[in-house]
Amino acid sequence: MPESGFRTWNGVESFEFVDGVRLHAIGGDQVLLCRVHYEPGKQVPRHAHEHTEQLMAVVEGSVRMTIGDETRELRPGDVVCVNKGIEHELHSENGVTFFEALAPVPLDHVPDKERDLVLAEGGATHVER
């Protein structure tokens, strides 16, 4: 890891997490920060991160999110925490952009599951295992 803690989104390519959902990811030793964008009408089905806690903050648009049995419509300024192992799903009718922080880093948020996320000057890069 570089000595400096400063990072930039510039030059960090997004990748398609699922159809119509793109991530820009920058990681540290124990946490991953993603800028996430859903195209209108897109969703991520019910799932859980068994070993990862997730914080999300909506910055543009809206998303309907279900955590366990509770569903809410999230808009800019709304923040949500999903604890380890809790099932959740998201659907955005009109599109949404949010930031999410995940710790520890889940490999399903890394562009190539057969590679590890490492840091380089100017952003995140990947190396084969």
Roles of regions detected by a PLM:
Residues Q43-P45, V80, K84-E89:
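Histidine-centered metal-chelating micro-motifs
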Residues M1-Q30, K113-R129:
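A short, N-terminal "cap"/entry segment at the start of jelly-roll beta-barrel domains
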Residues H51-V63:
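Glycine- and acidic-residue-biased ligand/ion/polar-headgroup-sensing regions
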Residues V59-E60, R75, N94:
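A cytosolic small-molecule/anion-sensing beta-strand core signal
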Residues D69-K84:
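Short acidic-glycine-tyrosine-enriched beta hairpin
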Residues D29, T66-E70:
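Short strand-coil-strand connectors
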